[in-house]
Amino acid sequence: MKKQLKGQQSFYDDKQRENVVSYYLMEDPVHQIYGVALEKSQENAGLIEWDSIPKVTDSMEVIDHMINSLIKYKVTPISLAESLDEIMTREEENGQSQI
C-alpha cells in the first residue's frame, strides 16, 4: 500500500497548542483500490491520533474528491469514518456517485 501526502490543515486547541492534520491518499497498485489516511500531530507531542480506511473506491477521481472534502472541512482522524460515510451518502443522493 503506497501513501502520498495530499494536504495539511493546522489549528490551535484550547491550550494554544498547534495541531496539524495530514491527509494521505492510500493506493494499492496491485488491486487498483484507493483509500485515505489521516494523521494528527501536535507540537512537542508528535503523532497523537491517526486513522485510515485503505479500501474506499477503485476510482482515483472519487478518492481525490473525498480527500479534498476532508481537507476543506478540516476532518480529524477521530471522525474520519463518519465523515467519509456522510460524503458518500450525499453524493449518492445527488446522483454523482461513482462508487
Where are these regions (language model features)?
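A positively charged, amphipathic N-terminal helix/segment that binds anionic biomolecules
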Residues: 18-28, 95
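Long, contiguous N-terminal structural blocks used for assembly/anchoring
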Residues: 4-7, 26, 96-99
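Intrinsically disordered, low-complexity N-terminal regions enriched in serine/proline/glycine
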Residues: 11, 22-23, 33, 72
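Mixed-charge, Lys/Arg-enriched low-complexity segments
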Residues: 44-99
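Negatively charged, low-complexity tracts enriched in Asp/Glu with abundant Ser/Thr
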Residues: 1-22
